[in-house]
């Protein structure tokens, strides 16, 4: 296998300059193409990665000022303290923690909390359940964030209508609901055709942020003294109680920072970093400092400073641009939710889900109907229940701070176990990050009664579902394994006393390659026949995102009648069994789909008082198993080649 070549195995020819072309010219052309490609990726990152954090100026500074003025007084020192906190939070958390460290902790180029969990589980063999639990919590918090982001983003943009036309205030929530329902309704059509405009629109958005902020900085240029951390520290120390509440609101300026890591696989580290350092970070800072300067010179403008500082002729266009930006931010989060859900299914944290591909060219563009429906319903319910973006702000921070806290914990394991850093080197950095994360998490967790319960409730329900699925599948595996016959024994018996042999190939899917598949045993028991060729097939998900076709299949022969095939897929890949079995032709097995039957076991589960799991968890697991997508569709097996054999199992 290692000696075989594929279409990508001739890099030396591709790297050589064209014959007759001076080397300097060839390299100049390569450099120009590289620069154009980099610009495209940077523009793409603006549209996907930075939509969430890019729309934070609409509400983050406003909420932080409201918290700082909770004692009824908003002094100049409060305004400078808040903008200084935002500047240093963005610098320490996004620029240093994520850009310098977290983005380097990729799993074969992929990012995201489940990728990080899989990477750490592969490196830390001793405590797999602990790491799995941490990863499940992180994934649940991500889904909580995915519910809140579209609601607060679009709602905050629509609130700009209150400035444009106060008479439209009663219609803010209905218009928001219409936009969100439309957004979720068109997901099944795919986003490939419209995604091409996301980057340019977000580039225009960031330029508008920077320009409007820069213009108003001249209202009071002394606002720039807030770059000095003295003002942030002074604000924290003068009124610790009010400052602690304000810190929770300041964190809203960083919501979306986790997207830098989650979308790492789509764009790569360099485009994400360059987009942040060249465009996003400078434009965000200009806007926040511009809002601060505007309020310093117009003290009465703290209600909706983002829209109030716009000139009258630009107000309506800015509301429309903000709406487009928040829809794009919502789309990025929805797409991210699909990706995380697929990873969770592949890692066996969730039951199989129907996954539809919306693009023939881009395999990453998927649509998951069940996730879309549940996410859409939850978002609309939040909008109708909370009605104002300021009410949702309390719910927003908990999910994101929790996700960041989980990321920091896993990052420490990456540093010490994968990067092989000494503890004395890694610990001070991680402790610094943990202090910041815990401070933000603590400042947000006290808002449970104000709306934080929604975020915690969503995450808790998802943790319960995922952990029940993990425990239930393990229990079912152990229970069925005790009752099953070792495969070696069946092979020996069939060799000594073979039943009637029928032509063709039978493929038996099983999760336990050491035991005889249930479908095989029932076939022998009821039909008393054995196929000419019998394949015991196991599908394995690797702890890395992508597995090459060269490493896809492993074949071992028991005897002339039985062989074992193991197919390995990455957790970002959609299993296609017929296509993968075609690779086995190179390994000596002449696979022919037209003479092959696939035998699948369909278990009917029943709750049992003696299962070892609580009865309620038994029933929840059974419900999840019943809602799982059909294995035939999930593994993309032609329905005409499938034989399903049903069995009943008492948990």
Curated annotation (Swiss-Prot):
It is found in: Cell inner membrane. GO terms for cellular component: plasma membrane. The chain crosses the membrane at residues 41-61, 82-102, 130-150, 163-183, 194-214, 235-255, 276-296, 309-329, 366-386, 395-415, 426-446, 450-470. InterPro entries: K+_transporter, K_trans_C, K_trans_N, Kup. Keywords: Cell inner membrane, Cell membrane, Ion transport, Membrane, Potassium, Potassium transport, Symport, Transmembrane, Transmembrane helix, Transport. It comes from the Bacteria. Its main location: membrane. The keyword Endoplasmic reticulum does not apply. It is a multi-pass membrane protein. It catalyses: K(+)(in) + H(+)(in) = K(+)(out) + H(+)(out). One of its GO terms (molecular function) is symporter activity. It holds the Pfam family K_trans. Transport of potassium into the cell. Likely operates as a K(+):H(+) symporter. Belongs to the HAK/KUP transporter (TC 2.A.72) family. This is Probable potassium transport system protein Kup. It comes from Brucella anthropi (strain ATCC 49188 / DSM 6882 / CCUG 24695 / JCM 21032 / LMG 3331 / NBRC 15819 / NCTC 12168 / Alc 37). The lineage of its organism: Bacteria, Pseudomonadati, Pseudomonadota, Alphaproteobacteria, Hyphomicrobiales.
